[in-house]
């Protein structure tokens, strides 16, 4: 792992066109977050939900369930609807929802498996859209054919086929 990490850091230094290596350039390389998947801090999600008084939340790329955890921790929030293209996460979502529902029975949550841009995915009405789409070509969580990096192999195709359509689709559900 040390060699792989060193190679990724060298790649980041090269991408940033760093002329020298120091604390600041190393921090910049680490903060790119493009060499490892990162967690969206549930505490940050909670703070955002609270600040905006989010009641009906739609999460277009539910990820590891971090924003779901923030939803349950928020003093606001009545319903959460998430979608994710990684089939391997469904069991984890179900377990999270089951446990959180014991503590917060007044809140409802559902996470479905699928590609948000597909027409068969119907988004519920919401007052808050909150998501963290995968970095193009970097975050590769499974070989599932619904993964955006496999469906859209070029950045322009990914933007046109994935990112822009899910944004447009979700805006229509805002009430």
Where are the regions a protein language model picked out?
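N-terminal accessory regions of S-adenosyl-L-methionine
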Residues: 1-38
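Mobile active-site "lid"/loop adjacent to the S-adenosyl-L-methionine
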Residues: 116, 126-166
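Long, hydrophobic/aromatic-enriched structural stretches that serve as scaffold segments
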Residues: 19-20, 33-46, 58, 62
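Conserved S-adenosyl-L-methionine
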Residues: 45-119, 128, 169-170
């Amino acid at each position: 792992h040390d060699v792989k990490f060193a190679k990724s850091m060298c790649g980041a230094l090269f991408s940033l066109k760093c002329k020298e290596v120091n604390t600041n350039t190393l921090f910049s390389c680490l903060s790119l977050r493009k060499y490892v998947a990162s967690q969206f801090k549930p505490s940050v999600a909670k703070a955002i939900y609270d600040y905006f008084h989010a009641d009906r939340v739609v999460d277009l790329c539910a990820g590891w369930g971090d924003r779901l955890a923030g939803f349950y921790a928020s003093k606001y929030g009545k319903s959460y609807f998430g979608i994710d293209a990684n089939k391997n996460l469904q069991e984890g979502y179900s377990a999270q929802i089951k446990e959180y529902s014991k503590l917060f029975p007044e809140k409802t949550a559902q996470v479905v498996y699928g590609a948000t841009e597909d027409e068969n995915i119907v988004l519920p009405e919401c007052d808050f859209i909150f998501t963290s789409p995968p970095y193009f070509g970097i975050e590769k969580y499974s070989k599932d054919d619904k993964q955006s990096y496999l469906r859209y192999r070029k950045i322009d195709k990914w933007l046109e086929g994935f990112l822009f359509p899910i944004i447009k689709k979700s805006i229509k559900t805002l009430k």
